Amino acid sequence: MQVSVETTQGLGRRVTITIAADSIETAVKSELVNVAKKVRIDGFRKGKVPMNIVAQRYGASVRQDVLGDLMSRNFIDAIIKEKINPAGAPTYVPGEYKLGEDFTYSVEFEVYPEVELQGLEAIEVEKPIVEVTDADVDGMLDTLRKQQATWKEKDGAVEAEDRVTIDFTGSVDGEEFEGGKASDFVLAMGQGRMIPGFEDGIKGHKAGEEFTIDVTFPEEYHAENLKGKAAKFAINLKKVEERELPELTAEFIKRFGVEDGSVEGLRAEVRKNMERELKSAIRNRVKSQAIEGLVKANDIDVPAALIDSEIDVLRRQAAQRFGGNEKQALELPRELFEEQAKRRVVVGLLLGEVIRTNELKADEERVKGLIEEMASAYEDPKEVIEFYSKNKELMDNMRNVALEEQAAEAVLAKAKVTEKETTFNELMNQQA
């Protein structure tokens, strides 16, 4: 076997391999012997068919199969010998084959980039310092009450957290536009669902009033024909409602799994959940900064084959989220996923190098802790932990999470880490 390797472009490689004619003939004869032992031909007993008849009937197909097998095996031998690490599936380009002559073919593929990590000492990471305060717990209790609130119609003017039922008709330069009209539209104030100025124009009005508000569509608005345009909305305010928050009764509290129904028990449970969320948020915030710094400090080439593979993964995930099938997934435009796919590949390659250079392996105690932390959010944590322990795929996924965290910590060990005090709400809003 003769082998030559050349660089085509960037990470592209072409391996050219020549297989000696006698090697091909030896392999063909060997395979024909195997075929002769199995075939049945009228007039002959099984295994007793003369080789010339076997060769006449099966020679062409056997030779084709043998060539394919030799191409594959010789390519594998070549990349092992040349210490080449292909990324993605190779493309075989067969040359012209002539009976009794050496056979030359080429294989084109991409290789993984050679990554030499640099700039880790210059990475800057800001670690949030946060405590869950009594005021934070009070705020979460208010949120829980709002989620369980009922609505009561009122006669007064619209206020910041009321709910309104309206008819509206929008126009630009006196012309109504598509999507600018609705009847019996229910709008909860303060949630930012409408364009700036819309809710402000409704506040202070009462049910039964009809009025017009002036707004301007944002420059980044999704509809091209409305970007930056001044508009008028004719409003018919049909109903105003205010929230009625439930009292913290034993019955209400027990809905959240606090068996004794006490306010103290609910506060303790809420605080525990908030502290679990906080721990995860801090960890994710620090890890994301470390990874972002790693990416900025290391500009690497990325094999197109890996990006294509990641795009397919993202397509399928998107299709599953929206109830699509495999065919619909592959029809989604690759442009929607290209940037995200490239970043995921870059991060994977860089973290892989961190793991390799630091000889990291998933810490089983960390894996156990991650599973327990995740399971604590469920009604029966023991059941969730047991389910994970019996599912190899889930356990492997959690080991990958642990290994990624360990890699991020290895980056952090060399980075410039500063601490910054912040609040629970500020941190959680950054995560959103």
Curated annotation (Swiss-Prot):
Keyword Cell division found: yes
GO biological process: 'de novo' cotranslational protein folding; cell division; chaperone-mediated protein folding; protein transport; protein unfolding
GO CC aspect terms: cytoplasm
Record-linked InterPro entries: PPIase_dom_sf, PPIase_FKBP_dom, Trig_fac, Trigger_fac_C, Trigger_fac_C_sf, Trigger_fac_ribosome-bd_bac, Trigger_fac_ribosome-bd_sf, Trigger_fact/SurA_dom_sf
All residue ranges annotated as the PPIase FKBP-type domain in the record: 161-246
Subcellular location(s) per record: Cytoplasm
Chief site of localization: cytoplasm
EC number: 5.2.1.8
Segments traversing the membrane: none
Pfam families hit by this protein: FKBP_C (PF00254), Trigger_C (PF05698), Trigger_N (PF05697)
MF (Gene Ontology): peptidyl-prolyl cis-trans isomerase activity; protein folding chaperone; ribosome binding
The protein's enzyme class: isomerase
UniProt catalytic activity: [protein]-peptidylproline (omega=180) = [protein]-peptidylproline (omega=0)
Keywords per UniProt: Cell cycle, Cell division, Chaperone, Cytoplasm, Isomerase, Rotamase
Subunit and interaction comment: Homodimer and monomer. In vivo most of the ribosomes are in complex with monomeric TF. Uncomplexed TF, however, is in a monomer-dimer equilibrium with approximately two thirds of TF existing in a dimeric state.
NCBIfam families, per the entry: tig (TIGR00115)
Comment block on domains: Consists of 3 domains; the N-terminus binds the ribosome, the middle domain has PPIase activity, while the C-terminus has intrinsic chaperone activity on its own.
Designated name of the protein: Trigger factor
Highest classification ranks of the organism: Bacteria, Pseudomonadati, Pseudomonadota, Gammaproteobacteria, Enterobacterales
